[in-house]
Amino acid sequence: MTHFIKICGITNKEDAQMVEAEGADALGFILHEESSRFIEIDKVISITESIKNNLEIFLVFVNKGQEFVQECLDRIPQAIPQFHGD
């Protein structure tokens, strides 16, 4: 069986690079202001630019409108949206 490993809640370059070095397949970024792991989209861009391997990038949205989601995906076109909430 093949496993797909995604580490969510990344908030800094050091953690992202450690996850990359340990062989994870994907990074997840929480774009929900009420989360303790919340990160601004500009910081996500900076972190993803520091990654050398082609890790999958997930953007986690909680009850966000279509306009905000589209804006984020326009800025990080390779990202995969992940939705939570109502």
Give residue ranges: language-model regions.
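Conserved N-terminal beta1-alpha1 strand-loop-helix module at the mouth
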Residues: 1-86
